[in-house]
Amino acid sequence: MSANCVSAAPTSPKNSDVEEIRKSATYHSSVWGNHFLSYTSDVTEITAAEKEQLEKLKEKVKNLLAQTPDESTGKMELIDAIQRLGVGYHFTTEIQESLRQIHEGQIRNDDDDVRVVALRFRLLRQGGYRAPCDVFEKFMDDGGNFKESLKKDVEGMLSLYEASYYGIDGEEIMDKALEFSSSHLESMLHNISTKTNKSLLRRLQEALDTPISKAAIRLGATKFISTYREDESHNEDILNFAKLDFNILQKMHQEEANYLTRWWEDLDLASKLDFARDRMVESYFWSLGVYFQPQYRTSRIYLTKIISIVAVIDDIYDVYGSFDDLRSFTDVIQSWKISNADELPPYMRICFEALLGIYEDMGDRIGAPYAIDTMKELVDTYMQEAEWCYTEYVPTVDEYMKVALVTGGYLMVATTFLTGINNITKKDFDWIRNRPRLLQVAEVLTRLMDDIAGHGTEKKTTAVSCYMKEYECSEMEASRELSKQVKKAWKDLNDEWMEPRSSSAEIIGCIVNMSRVLHIMYSTGDDGFSDSSTRTTQAVKTLLVDHPMN
């Protein structure tokens, strides 16, 4: 929303200058156009030979997992490789049982090796176990700092660095681990020869850019496959299994992108509503980041369609609609009746009809009513932000966040995705509808990431502008303080992930994974959804366009 506001209390809407500002936003056209129409059935067909080979390799990897003792460092390294290669979903039961054994045993024979201790800690916390952080105390000196001698161990530093991102609020030792390891790795980065240590240089850059805890699994796998291939101790069966699985899934995802492109072209919203963002492919990338596995196809389809339409609705409220039209649009969506749409301008009616069509496709799924309710709530808060804009009102940070956490769309997105999963129950939807702590934390995290990245690039009210106004500070000071809240939110997500969990791992994973994909879009300081011509485009290209792994 427009940030050209003053700190007066809300009054009646004004016309004139504010409306002109609201109509000034411009967005680049779709980077992809109809590119994915080229992925026809003959291109995306998965052959019988591929399926047979995948099953053979899967059995070999499964046997390897069974034969490697849980009491060994090799078992932890095996689990880590399988998960980072993106194929852990094939062995969920086996990995969970191994981690249970490791947790119960809390093996101590390698306690003097920081690499192994950090790896064990990370794997257990990734698996939901509250592994104690005091295992790192033996690596501290009398002054309470990590021993300088650890800096000689590059692999140990990398392992400690990755583990440090699984800390929770109040774990001072994990904060020290992050500061110690990251500063040393950054120093190493500037001193490594690009000629003699290309592999290590790339690993350091990738780790510092996106630690494992914040990485979307599928994107992380594309990078780790190359790293694993270069490891002299790699297992050829695991490597071949990961590459084949990636290629098969890529075909599935290309077919989905083809279907969605045809759906989007049939709607023709991009030409009918040319003031709005055309971001269908970026919306699919978002849904792919939540869950990429084959069984979540329906959820990805629902979510991609909804995000694509919501981007247009958001632009109607932010950019194009007059105040009176926005009020009418809000009322019609609250009624959820197509018969009431006759009073709307044509461009709003087109959008409303498209929105209704998606929810009609959900039929009698348990989550459909919940998904509709969250959409109504989202639009209602869009209207609240529009009123702020038209009355030139700058809310306090608390006022802003109460509304902005909803306009961020996190609950709507999560509910929509879960609607496509058959085994999600009414109890599950009631739980998430009540906004549990996990969801609140994720909403704060992504809202602030978006606002910090977007402040100054668009004429919008953000948490940064509200903080600057309320606390009379500079943009840098406001961003610094809000960034502290982002760091705490990541820790709180870790806390919610670990046992005892408030819901199933599948639902919690959905919410956490959404934060990871949004981290990709916003972590460079840019809005990677609205301006998708940079990092997001490369991510889409990596997952959906680049040639298969070989």
Curated annotation (Swiss-Prot):
Annotated binding of Mg(2+) 1, by residue: 314, 318
Residues noted as binding Mg(2+) 3 in the record, renumbered to the chain: 450, 458
Gene Ontology molecular function terms on file: magnesium ion binding; terpene synthase activity
Enzyme class: lyase
Keywords: Lyase, Magnesium, Metal-binding
Residues spanned by motif DDXXD motif: 314-318
Cofactor(s) it depends on: Mg(2+); Mn(2+)
EC numbers for this chain: 4.2.3.198
Catalytic activity from the UniProt record: (2E,6E)-farnesyl diphosphate = (+)-beta-selinene + diphosphate; (2E,6E)-farnesyl diphosphate = alpha-selinene + diphosphate
Cofactor binding comment, as recorded: Binds 3 Mg(2+) or Mn(2+) ions per subunit.
Residues reported to bind Mg(2+) 2: 314, 318
Pathway: Secondary metabolite biosynthesis; terpenoid biosynthesis
GO biological process: diterpenoid biosynthetic process
Family: Belongs to the terpene synthase family.
Function text: Sesquiterpene synthase that catalyzes the formation of alpha- and beta-selinene from trans,trans-farnesyl diphosphate (FPP). Also produces some nerolidol.
Domain topic, free-text comment: The Asp-Asp-Xaa-Xaa-Asp/Glu (DDXXD/E) motif is important for the catalytic activity, presumably through binding to Mg(2+).
Protein name as annotated: Selinene synthase
